[in-house]
């Protein structure tokens, strides 16, 4: 009987502890990962997969995904920039171009954080890049939007 309980307990710990930290090549940072429940991690995983398929609703939901603020926000920005690199700036630009000004709010900050503090070239060093040089179309989109 004790073996059954121990086996069940082990199964529960393994199941709950199996959060995804890499989803189709998109890295989820340690801080964001640590502050997620298993269910939240599965929702984030689903949003990442759908965003890579250029699902507009998923991209919007990803921007609004609860991240706990501070370092979690930077890590969500890093997820977004990794997605942009994977699907291409042109595709991400097309998606955002279809959104209202209200829906676009927030993306600029996340992208800036992801470029500056993320490791998008996976060399173990923060990139410290700027949107104007890295994603000029998106930069122009945000400039136009703020001038409305």
Question: Where are the regions a protein language model picked out?
Answer:
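Amphipathic alpha-helical scaffolding segments comprising HEAT/armadillo-like alpha-solenoid repeats
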Residues: 25, 53-63, 86-96
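C-terminal motif of bacterial Sec signal peptides marking the signal peptidase cleavage site
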Residues: 14-17
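Solenoid-like repeat scaffolds
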Residues: 31-33, 64-69, 101
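Positively charged n-region of N-terminal signal peptides that target proteins for export
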Residues: 1-4
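Alpha-helical segments in soluble extracytoplasmic regions
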Residues: 43-51, 57-75, 79-83
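Start-of-domain marker
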Residues: 23-48, 52-53
């Amino acid at each position: 009987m004790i073996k059954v309980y121990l086996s069940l307990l082990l199964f529960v710990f393994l199941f709950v502890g199996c959060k995804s930290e890499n989803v189709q090549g998109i890295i989820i940072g340690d801080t964001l990962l640590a502050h997620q429940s298993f269910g939240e991690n599965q929702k984030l995983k689903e949003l990442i997969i759908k965003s890579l398929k250029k699902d507009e609703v998923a991209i919007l939901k990803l921007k609004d995904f609860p991240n706990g603020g501070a370092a979690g926000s930077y890590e969500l920005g890093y997820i977004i920039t990794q997605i942009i690199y994977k699907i291409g700036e042109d595709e991400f630009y097309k998606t955002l171009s279809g959104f209202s000004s209200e829906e676009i709010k927030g993306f600029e900050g996340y992208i800036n954080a992801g470029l500056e503090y993320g490791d998008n070239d996976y060399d173990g060093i923060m990139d410290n890049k700027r949107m104007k040089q890295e994603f000029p179309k998106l930069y122009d989109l945000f400039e136009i939007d703020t001038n409305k």
